[in-house]
Amino acid sequence: MDKIFVDEAVNELQTIQDMLRWSVSRFSAANIWYGHGTDNPWDEAVQLVLPSLYLPLDIPEDMRTARLTSSEKHRIVERVIRRVNERIPVAYLTNKAWFCGHEFYVDERVLVPRSPIGELINNKFAGLISKQPQHILDMCTGSGCIAIACAYAFPDAEVDAVDISPDALAVAEQNIEEHGLIHNVIPIRSDLFRDLPKVQYDLIVTNPPYVDAEDMSDLPNEYRHEPELGLASGTDGLKLTRRILGNAADYLADDGVLICEVGNSMVHLMEQYPDVPFTWLEFDNGGDGVFMLTKEQLIAAREHFAIYKD
């Protein structure tokens, strides 16, 4: 962005509303990619401008006319420039993201939270589980957002938050502490189930890496700032999912269920395993590629995934 253009913004824009409008204009003109918690330039601007001012997203309407200091304007303009020129997701610029109505710390060690599984958590998995879960596993926890949201939804449950990445677990631990859930959510480093004791979970929720090789090569630049370890999963996007399917039954209680997100790779899963009775879940707020299997169904399908058992 031209320096004269930037100086003009700092000198002439005065209020929060001015900065919101200017940010929307810049985002719209730059044709940036939305997909890290927002789907339009207005929401993108709100999530950049207000956290940059250490304000909540739901400030009163009349507060938007508040005037800004020069340093505040410079901070916002700098972040807008980086969002446009470097295609950095807003969450990495502000170190804030939201999931299930809760705020989380994020940086480039973890993916930005955006899973449709959040809708299931908000609905307490209604119609999917037969009882209140006492022991929940969040596999591939990343920032810990799913594990923490589950702990809020089921305050009497113990939640294990598993990831192979020590960097991701450091972020998850920070979020667990900030939410005051150190006695409810337990971070565990493990290569999927490989280093876990044989615990029986009532519910296993997982959003593993599932982007196939073709989609990885075509991802917008915004996704290049996210850890590849959290995205890529082999040629067809199912490298980790097969291992999960090969092992999950051993870690589920008799009436337990597995809920797994595979995104666009659902096509490959259905093509390769037509005999497996995946229940594909529907969402009111958008999203797809999430299936459910019961322990009984996983046991019945074992022959398909036996070679992937740890």
Curated annotation (Swiss-Prot):
Changing residue 142 to D: No longer methylates uL3, grows poorly at 25 degrees Celsius. Keywords: Methyltransferase, S-adenosyl-L-methionine, Transferase. It comes from the Bacteria. The keyword Transport does not apply. One of its GO terms (cellular component) is cytosol. CDD domains: AdoMet_MTases. Pfam families: MTS. GO terms for biological process: protein methylation. Its EC number is 2.1.1.298. InterPro entries: DNA_methylase_N6_adenine_CS (IPR002052), HemK-like (IPR004556), Ribosome_uL3_MTase (IPR017127), SAM-dependent_MTases_sf (IPR029063), Small_mtfrase_dom (IPR007848). GO terms for molecular function: nucleic acid binding; protein methyltransferase activity; protein-glutamine N-methyltransferase activity; S-adenosylmethionine-dependent methyltransferase activity. It catalyses: L-glutaminyl-[ribosomal protein uL3] + S-adenosyl-L-methionine = N(5)-methyl-L-glutaminyl-[ribosomal protein uL3] + S-adenosyl-L-homocysteine + H(+). Belongs to the protein N5-glutamine methyltransferase family. PrmB subfamily. Specifically methylates ribosomal protein uL3 on 'Gln-150'. Does not methylate the translation termination release factors RF1 or RF2. This is Ribosomal protein uL3 glutamine methyltransferase. The gene is prmB.
